[in-house]
A protein has these predicted regions:
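Carbohydrate-binding surfaces in secreted/extracellular proteins
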Residues: 37, 88, 152-180
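Extracellular beta-strand elements of beta-rich domains used
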Residues: 37, 207-211
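Short carbohydrate-recognition loop motifs
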Residues: 52-72, 193
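Secretory/extracellular carbohydrate-interaction modules
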Residues: 66-134
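Flexible glycan-contacting loops in extracellular carbohydrate-active proteins
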Residues: 180-205
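Extracellular carbohydrate-recognition regions
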Residues: 22-48
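Short, aromatic/His-centered strand-loop micro-motif at the edge of beta-sheets
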Residues: 134-158
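C-terminal motif of bacterial Sec signal peptides marking the signal peptidase cleavage site
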Residues: 16-18
Length: 215
């Protein structure tokens, strides 16, 4: 069960890694951005402090949460996406199964974005964070529903979002598990996130990110 509330890692914790500007030059037709996440290209803003660490290691972008009730993320630098299809492989590397990891998208600032998260014990949630209400959470789908599509424990899960206008579809391991409509945010940045609840020690690795145009 999801009982705890997250504390968000603040903007003061941001560590800017490199200054390379993103470009779509050389990408296949229809591909907006692609990154195997094997090494730091300078395209990501990484959060790092005593409570959370984001780094490139072992051929992945890894997020480690060392405090309870906290979420942290790595954000793609200098790019906004409105309509897109995003796919990424996420692997639980350590810590309790009562965790959270996934994608934040259409990010306006640290207090305004959508999130699609799954957990190591087989749940998922789609939520919106609202700056106007002090960073409160709004459920886009029913909060933390169980799905047999999610591989539990120390496993790899392929996470996918299709965003077209105000309509979203959410997939895990090639199975659609939810869809929703919301028009609060029309475009914004994207990020990869991980979070803890009562127990710290959550560690997640991300691989093989690709963002394409919807068909």
């Amino acid at each position: 069960m999801r009982l705890a509330r997250f504390i968000i890692v603040g903007a003061a914790a941001l560590v800017l890694m490199g200054c390379n500007r993103l470009t779509s030059e050389g990408l296949p037709e229809g591909v907006l951005y692609q990154d195997d996440l094997d090494a730091d290209t300078g395209n990501w803003i990484l959060e790092s402090d005593m409570d959370a660490n984001a780094r490139f290691a072992e051929g992945q972008l890894q997020l480690e949460i060392t405090s309870p009730n906290l979420i942290a993320w790595a954000e793609l630098r200098e790019r906004e996406f409105g309509d897109f299809v995003l796919e990424v492989d996420a692997t639980q590397l350590g810590g309790p199964d009562d965790n959270s990891y996934g994608i934040i998208f259409r990010v306006k600032n640290p207090s305004a974005y959508y999130s699609f998260d799954i957990s190591g014990d087989g749940y998922y949630a789609v939520r919106r964070r609202d700056e106007a209400d002090g960073g409160s959470w709004t459920r886009i789908t029913e909060d933390w529903l169980q799905s047999s599509a999610i591989h539990q424990g120390a496993s790899i899960n392929k996470i996918k979002i299709v965003a077209q206008g105000s309509h979203f579809a959410f997939y895990v391991n090639n199975e659609q598990i939810a869809e929703a409509d919301d028009d609060t945010y029309r475009s914004g940045a994207i990020g990869l996130n991980a979070g803890s609840f009562h127990e710290p020690g959550v560690k997640v690795g991300f691989d093989n990110l690709i963002i394409t145009k919807p068909e």
